[in-house]
Amino acid sequence: MSIRRGHARVLFNEGAYAEDTMRSGRAGAEVLRKARGQFEREGVEIKALRRCDAEGRDGTKLPACFKVYLPAPSGKFGLVFRFIRHREGLALRYLAFGIRHHPRDSNAQTVYEIAHRRLHGKLP
């Protein structure tokens, strides 16, 4: 599959994708499905990627990770990725999708906490 110039290929983990789709509610699942379709066809535009904080204020550790906001440019949802070597060069590995920031009294995990858990095997 040919990825557009200035874009990075995205590789989705089916288990993580299924978990995130089920957890995200109807609106979130629709945003995720639409983004996946676009990213698999075209890739992610490199200039849309934002570097995640290596160490977040919430205790998350996401070194060398990148994020996009959905809907662009500053939606309430986020996708977190990490670059990996792939047989066709560098690619973005999908780590997590979810709400970027919850209200202070919420116990729900943010996309950054989900990505941290998937990288490190535990919550921060």
Residue positions per predicted region:
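A short, surface-exposed loop/turn module that caps and links secondary-structure elements
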Residues: 40-72
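Arg/Lys-rich, positively charged N-terminal/basic patches that mediate binding to nucleic acids
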Residues: 1-39, 119-124
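Intrinsically disordered, low-complexity regions enriched in serine, threonine, proline
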Residues: 2, 47-48, 101, 115
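A generic structural signal for short, solvent-exposed coil/turn residues
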Residues: 2-4, 60, 73, 86
